[in-house]
């Protein structure tokens, strides 16, 4: 069965571990699958696709994804391609490689959706608050689908291909098959007969507040604070939902604060996955864990 893949880049996507997560789920099957930090929703969408009878809840608190859900993303994407005058017979990567001048022309038009730019070099002069065609939500959708995962106002070299268009159509269709909510995490939530997947925001330590962390794009471009206190709230959530025929699979970075709390509070099994990843042109070795609590 063909996998449903998000038609955009997403930091922290668990898709690379789909096979491992699926195996754990099959060994601990429940009638409900709950992903409380669902992000791009790659795992819940594919679980629903593979296990048709499964009841799936995906909670997403991410302004970029929420804009994608509010708008007719396929219509906005096609309107964006038409606006920059892109030939749908031409793959964006081929355009970037073989016709760089034409790519740069389309990129200038694209950047003008968000900013007033120099007509000669395309350099941004000032932000554009309003656009005559695209509203703010539509502009965010264009940034997600055509720029670098919503983090830029310049075209990526993969902004269009027939396969990307097909992936978007499949993704949008799949969204209609699951229940989606957009709530900040609450330790008082209660579930039963569920496989609960917990992958809290990717965190980055900041210098001024030793115990504070920032969840990458958890609620806005700047994120919101996710502290060690919030790790404690996650522990309380698990405790509240034990003894209700639930299974928990927690995902995180090796040796982080949450992993220590899990070891101290539960009988649990840790599975460490090592992999290599290229970030900004640099190859780095990564290690992350799954923690299974029954």
Predicted regions and their residues:
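S-adenosyl-L-methionine
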Residues: 1-34, 42-46, 281
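Conserved proline-anchored active-site loop of SAM-dependent methyltransferases
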Residues: 33-47, 58-62, 145, 193-210
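Short, polar loop motifs at secondary-structure junctions
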Residues: 38-41, 164-168, 253-257
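Class I S-adenosyl-L-methionine-dependent methyltransferase module
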Residues: 54-176, 210
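Conserved SAM/SAH-binding loop
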Residues: 182-187
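SAM-dependent methyltransferase catalytic-core segment centered on the flexible catalytic loop
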Residues: 195, 203-249
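Conserved Class I SAM-dependent methyltransferase catalytic core
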Residues: 231-278
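Core SAM-dependent methyltransferase catalytic element
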Residues: 279-294
């Amino acid at each position: 069965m063909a996998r449903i893949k998000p038609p955009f880049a997403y930091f922290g996507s668990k898709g690379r571990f789909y096979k491992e997560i699926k195996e754990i789920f099959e060994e601990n099957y429940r009638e409900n699958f709950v992903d409380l930090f669902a992000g791009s929703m790659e795992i819940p969408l594919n679980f629903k696709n593979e296990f048709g009878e499964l009841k799936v809840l995906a909670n997403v608190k991410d302004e970029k994804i929420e804009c994608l859900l509010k708008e007719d993303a396929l219509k906005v994407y096609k309107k964006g391609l038409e606006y920059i005058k892109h030939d749908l017979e031409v793959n964006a990567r081929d355009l970037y490689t073989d016709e760089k001048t034409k790519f740069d022309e389309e990129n200038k038009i694209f950047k003008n959706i968000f900013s007033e730019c120099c007509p000669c070099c395309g350099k941004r002069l000032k932000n554009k608050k309003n656009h005559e065609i695209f509203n703010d939500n539509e502009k965010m959708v264009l940034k997600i689908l055509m720029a670098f995962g919503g983090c830029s106002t310049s075209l990526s070299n993969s902004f269009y291909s027939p396969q990307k268009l097909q992936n978007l159509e499949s993704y949008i269709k799949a969204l209609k098959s699951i229940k989606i909510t957009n709530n900040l995490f609450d330790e008082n939530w209660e579930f039963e007969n569920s496989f609960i997947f917990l992958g809290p925001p990717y965190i980055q330590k900041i210098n001024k507040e030793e115990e504070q962390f920032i969840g990458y794009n958890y609620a806005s471009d700047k994120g919101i604070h996710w502290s060690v206190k919030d790790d404690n709230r996650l522990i309380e959530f698990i405790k509240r939902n034990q003894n209700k025929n639930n299974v928990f699979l927690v995902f995180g970075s090796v040796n982080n604060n949450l992993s220590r709390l899990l070891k101290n509070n539960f009988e649990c099994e840790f599975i460490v996955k090592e992999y290599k990843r290229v970030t900004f042109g640099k190859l780095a070795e990564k290690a992350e864990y799954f923690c299974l609590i029954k």
